[in-house]
Amino acid sequence: MLTEIQEGKALNSVVKHITQEKINLYAEASGDFNPIHVDESFAANTPLGGTIAHGMLNLAYVSEMMTSAFGRSWLSEGKLRAKFKEPARPGDTLTINGKIDCVEQKDDVSYANCSFECRNQKGEMIVTGETIVKFSSDKK
């Protein structure tokens, strides 16, 4: 967890390798068995040309980064807005980076506004977005 919450501070990156097995396990956990995710034969005959990871799997990795930085504050008081740019595919290695853009205080509560991006090993943007985390001012 962050010991100091200040504007411009980078969050610890998360790096994850996407495999078909991870995609299949996520499908089981989420109940989302859309064939674009789990049926390689079906997906090969679509414009995407193969299976892709669930968007929410990618966001789970963003949430992992935010939980590492803000702990329970993220889990209970965090909000996320994301834009999906490209699909993540089996074989991709995703790197999720984030930073604190600004810290605002209202009464005895502080808010950290963060930005994040998720890129694959080719540097292609997969997901980008913003988060807001509410936390007690004494953690600042």
Residue ranges, per PLM feature:
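Catalytic strand-loop segment that frames the active site of acyl-thioester-processing enzymes
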Residues: 1-53
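HotDog/MaoC-like acyl-thioester-processing domains
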Residues: 1-12, 89-140
